[in-house]
UniProtKB/Swiss-Prot annotation:
Protein source organism: Aeropyrum pernix (strain ATCC 700893 / DSM 11879 / JCM 9820 / NBRC 100138 / K1)
Its job: Non-catalytic component of the exosome, which is a complex involved in RNA degradation. Contributes to the structuring of the Rrp41 active site.
Assembly description: Component of the archaeal exosome complex. Forms a hexameric ring-like arrangement composed of 3 Rrp41-Rrp42 heterodimers. The hexameric ring associates with a trimer of Rrp4 and/or Csl4 subunits.
HAMAP family xrefs: Exosome_Rrp42
Lineage: Archaea, Thermoproteota, Thermoprotei, Desulfurococcales, Desulfurococcaceae
Protein name per the record: Exosome complex component Rrp42
Principal subcellular localisation of the protein: cytoplasm
Length: 276
């Protein structure tokens, strides 16, 4: 079942003032400075029946990702490419504000930001997913499950997605005399071909202060957030603004600068997670 979150509660003025008093000193809860993301832990191979799976802990935020592969037809406009789709579910146990129901704009936005980031850099070699050109290709479904929401779902979900793609293996298959593709349940097939790695880094503006990787309370007191997609070569490949506040040119430059630095932390965590 898909899950939809309700609107997060507005933080009381006293909470915002408490955060501002810390920010004026250059600090945040958890002994972080403004530019430092929370601790990142990535565990792969947690779901036996998935082609790839991972659990990401970004502070107290936890996201599980899994990828399954099936055989299907390619899109008519891309007959020589496989198919990759991303879906996100907000599990009710993750937050008291999440309730059962169809995905709303927040879940859809999360999945689309992850999906667009992958497509912008051509993260997965979709041509390598072709089984029979124009007829049969691998269809990959990446499912994201938010199981503990303590802020910054974008970065945790993007890390989880990259972790599963980097460790996934396609199933083995055989082709029958009639042309039917038969997937074998025994043994592992080829590794998924990932051409480029990409992460997102979320920054938030609270009054005049810019912070990296906001927790749930910082999100509640923030005026606006910017999600910056960065590839492994340090290129900015996507931007997504959320929230009703405004950003100056100087704000955006600061946010991008912070994001480029923080992305190095995320890429290092990914590299450590996929080491044999």
């Amino acid at each position: 079942m898909s899950i939809t979150p309700h609107r997060l509660p507005v933080a009381p003025v006293i909470v915002r003032e408490a955060y501002l008093s810390l920010l004026r000193k250059g600090w945040r809860p958890g002994d972080r400075d403004l530019k430092t993301p929370r601790n990142v832990k990535i565990e792969t191979g947690i779901i036996e029946k998935a082609e790839g799976s991972a659990l990401v802990k970004l502070g107290k935020t936890q996201v599980i990702a899994g990828v399954k592969a099936g055989v299907g037809a390619p899109f008519k406009d891309t007959p020589n490419q496989g198919v990759l789709t991303v879906h996100a579910e907000f599990v009710p146990l993750a937050s008291p504000v999440f309730e059962p129901g169809p995905p709303d704009e927040n879940a859809i936005e999360l999945a689309r930001v992850v999906d667009r980031s992958l497509r912008e850099v051509g993260a997965v070699d979709l041509e390598s997913l072709v089984i029979r050109p124009g007829e049969k290709v691998w269809v990959l479904w990446v499912d994201l499950y938010i199981i503990d929401h303590d802020g910054n779902l974008f970065d945790a979900s993007m890390l989880a997605t990259m972790a599963v793609l980097l460790t996934a293996r396609l199933p083995r298959y055989e082709e029958s005399e009639t042309g039917e593709i038969i997937i074998s349940k025994e043994g592992e097939g080829e590794e998924l071909k990932v051409k480029t790695r990409v992460v997102t880094v979320t920054t938030a503006k609270i009054d005049r202060y810019i912070v990296v990787d906001p927790n749930i309370e910082e999100e509640a007191v923030s005026d606006v957030r910017l999600v910056t997609a960065v590839d492994e070569n340090g290129r900015i490949v996507g931007l997504q603004k959320t929230g009703m506040g405004s950003l100056t040119e100087a704000d955006i430059e600061t946010m991008i600068g912070y994001s480029l630095e923080a992305s190095k932390v995320y890429f290092k965590a990914l590299e450590e997670a996929i080491k044999p």
